[in-house]
A protein has these predicted regions:
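N-terminal phosphate/diphosphate-binding loop that engages ATP/GTP or pyrophosphate donors
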Residues: 1-42
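Functionally engaged cysteine thiol sites
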Residues: 1-11, 55, 59-61, 91
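Cytosolic-facing regulatory segments adjacent to core modules
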Residues: 27-83
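Short, small-residue-rich loop/turn micro-motifs
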Residues: 53, 164, 170
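Conserved catalytic-core segment of NTP-binding enzymes
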Residues: 60-162, 168
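Conserved active-site and cofactor/substrate-binding residues in soluble primary-metabolism enzymes
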Residues: 62, 115, 180-187
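C-terminal boundary of histidine-terminating zinc-finger modules
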Residues: 170-183
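C-terminal alpha-helix
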Residues: 188-199
């Protein structure tokens, strides 16, 4: 259960600076580091940090700038940092992910979905430095349709079939870690990670 988000921490530290005596940058960084690690939800073999959303409408600039620094901070303490970006090109345009090792794009098999992925890839080619890029196509209802799924210039790392058990788990508040090893999403993730040479 998430008790505090990254944006909560940012606003709290900003408020403490505005209300109190001036503080050195190193002190603020140290406090941020401590609170970020304290806020993480620890699970077996991974940790989760919720970004949160600004309460005011409009610009995400402050959150984005802070998020960039946090990503750099975390990268030194974890083997992998996975950033789950919002759907669409907004996250790319905000330049939160300026440099990554692997850019993995997720879509359903619809023509509209694959066209969006194509657009995101073209924008990312201009704004993001990455070593490898690929797509995962999920919710595939009919394996016979797989040969017709195509994304210009992007390798399809895996196709994942629709899974009633996964849907049932989601309704019950269970995670993918509660699925059996042969579940479509587990097999698809393993296939994608193998192609990316992470596994």
């Amino acid at each position: 259960e998430v008790k505090e988000t990254l944006d909560d921490i940012r606003k709290s530290i900003v408020a403490s600076v505005e209300d109190g005596a001036p503080r050195e940058a190193i002190e603020l960084l140290s406090e941020a580091r401590y609170r970020i690690f304290d806020t993480m939800v620890e699970q077996q073999r991974f940790s989760f940090l919720a970004i949160g959303r600004p309460e005011t409408a409009g610009c995400y600039c402050k959150v984005n700038a802070y998020l960039k620094e946090v990503i750099n901070l975390l990268a030194n303490d974890f083997d992998y940092v996975v950033i789950d970006g919002e759907a669409g090109i907004e996250q790319i345009n905000r330049r939160v992910m300026e440099k990554v090792t692997h850019l993995v794009l997720i879509t359903d098999p619809s023509r509209k979905g694959t066209q969006v992925i194509d657009t995101i890839k073209r924008v990312a080619d201009e704004l993001v430095m990455y070593d490898r890029c690929g797509a995962i196509v999920n919710r595939v209802t009919d394996p016979a349709l797989i040969p017709y799924i195509h994304i210009n210039g992007t390798e399809i790392l895996a196709t994942i079939g629709s899974d009633p058990q996964h849907a049932a788990n989601d309704i019950q508040g269970l995670s993918v870690f509660d699925l059996p090893e042969d579940a479509p999403v587990i097999r698809g993730a393993r296939e994608a990670l193998t192609k990316l040479e992470i596994l």
